[in-house]
Design a protein with these regions (language model features):
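C-terminal motif of bacterial Sec signal peptides marking the signal peptidase cleavage site
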Residues: 18-21
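N-terminal lobe/hinge region of extracytoplasmic solute-binding protein
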Residues: 49-100, 219
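Aromatic- and charge-enriched surface segment that lines or borders ligand/interaction sites
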Residues: 94-142, 175, 266, 326-327
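Surface-exposed binding/hinge segments that line
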Residues: 144-202
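Gly/Pro-rich hinge or "lid" segments in bacterial periplasmic/extracellular proteins
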Residues: 189-248, 252, 381-382, 386
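Ligand-site clamp/hinge motif
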Residues: 207-215, 240-287
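A bilobed periplasmic-binding-protein/Venus flytrap-type ligand-binding module shared by bacterial periplasmic
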Residues: 238-241, 303-331, 348
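Append "and occasionally in soluble cytosolic enzymes with long acidic Gly/Pro-rich linkers
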Residues: 326-430
């Protein structure tokens, strides 16, 4: 029996789950030897289900949504790659540290790469992207990608017309000087999908995010070109025959918005060939015992946090502001860490697809802390109570609730981002 393979990708705290299914149409072809083998098939259309509707910010420097990123990933390319060890490595962009100044790097972009409008991609496009991020009128979420460069802050504050730490050498080479010595300068630097200088140079920065070049006719240097956008419903893409890595095998990619609860049915019906799913859907598939569905797992660097708001945040400047006094007490933070049963939360919200972390870098990452490297806060109610007592957080009026050291009611407010799982709120209350 010939099988058509469909896949579901699931991103949890530390795993990616892939689902494959037998197709119902015997005329469809692919590799028949095994469910995860490679296929020599070319042409055709791949329909991908996405749960989050795109917001229309189809350039990476303006987007903050998964829906938009799902689209951008098909038509634009990052300038760097990440190896199996999760370390960055050259792709379109390569770099070399200056022998006499370790804050200075020389960057080169590959020659022969074209934008999807036929114009050549050069270092000018990347430099233009960086200058845009530092512009005072830029209000997107990516300023941090240029803040590490010398002179970016001065341009951001209107004290300079350009970033002093960027020097163009030729059309394919530029020199960048970082502001200070930091281990993650290269990681922080904006090397994701660039924008075209030719397309955007005559659009005021304050108007870019709402322009047709972002919302209706986006172009990139990736394997597919945007053909048609139906707001909130679908995006159609066609292959870029001039893609710098070679012509893609699949002719067309159709991205379709599908409710998470309908993903499994849509896959089994053949309405979609691939989809992004959440933990509850992964559990549903696993529990179904269907012979047509298979979940494959791999480490991921995705994580979810319960954090303390220690400072105000200046959204425009994208900087941390003054301290908030409420959680500055270390013993209070430690007590709350001991009081939270993280394993119970993972089982309740993510159905076991994950594990507790003891830092902001997941253990799957090459720089993540290994077991025993940092202090682990295991669930311990007695220890939490002891630390609260030591910090002066006691029930001083006998009402059964603790007050702060000044005798005022102590209230903890939890805020959660909007998600695709409607059961999060009632289950949080139950916990």
């Amino acid at each position: 029996m010939k099988k058509a393979y469909r896949y579901l990708w699931f991103l949890s705290l530390i795993v990616v789950v892939v689902l494959s299914a037998c197709g119902k149409n015997g005329n469809e072809t692919s590799n028949t030897s095994n469910k995860t083998g490679k296929s020599d098939a070319k042409g055709g259309t791949l329909t991908v289900g996405i749960a989050e509707p795109p917001e229309g910010n189809f350039q990476s420097i303006f987007t903050g949504s998964t829906g938009d990123s799902n689209v951008i990933d098909f038509f634009n390319d990052s300038l760097i790659d990440v190896g199996d060890d999760l370390k960055i490595k050259p792709k379109i962009l390569s770099w070399e540290k200056d022998k006499n100044d370790d804050l200075k790097y020389t960057f080169k972009v590959k020659k022969g790469i074209q934008w999807q409008d036929g114009n050549p991609f050069t270092i000018n496009d990347w430099v233009f992207t960086l200058e845009t991020l530092a512009d005072p009128d830029y209000d997107g979420p990516r300023y941090s990608g240029v803040a590490v460069i010398q002179g970016a802050e001065e341009k951001r504050n209107g004290q300079a017309d350009r970033i002093s730490g960027i020097k163009k050498i030729d059309d394919y080479t530029a020199e960048i000087t970082f502001k200070e010595h930091k281990a993650n300068n290269l990681l922080e630097l904006w090397t994701s999908a660039p924008i075209s200088e030719k397309v955007f140079k005559d659009i005021p920065v304050k108007d870019m995010a709402k322009s047709d070049a972002v919302r209706k006719n986006p172009i990139g240097i990736g394997p597919y070109k945007v053909k048609r956008i139906v707001d909130g419903e679908s995006v159609e893409l066609v292959k870029n025959k001039d893609y710098w890595r070679g012509e893609p095998n699949i002719d067309n990619i159709n991205l379709r918005v599908v409710e998470q609860t309908s993903m499994t049915q849509a896959l089994e019906n053949g309405d979609i060939d691939m989809a992004t799913i959440t933990a509850p859907i992964a559990k549903e598939i696993k529990d179904s015992g269907s012979e047509n569905l298979q979940l494959l797992q791999a480490p991921s660097t995705s994580y979810a946090i319960v954090g303390f708001v220690l400072n105000d945040y200046d959204k425009k400047a994208q900087k941390i502001g003054k301290e908030r006094p409420k959680y500055q007490d270390k013993k209070l933070r430690q007590a709350m860490a001991y009081a939270i049963n993280r394993k119970e939360w993972i089982d309740a919200f993510y159905y076991g697809y994950g594990k507790p972390l003891n830092g902001l870098i997941p253990s799957a990452h090459w720089s993540g802390a290994k077991e025993g490297d940092v202090k682990e806060y295991k669930y311990d109610v007695d220890k939490a109570k002891q630390l609260l007592d030591e910090g002066g957080y006691k029930d001083k009026d006998g009402d059964g609730f603790r007050e702060d050291p000044q005798g005022k009611p102590f209230v903890v407010n939890l805020k959660h981002y909007a998600g695709s799982n409607p059961t999060f709120e009632p289950r949080t209350a139950a916990l």
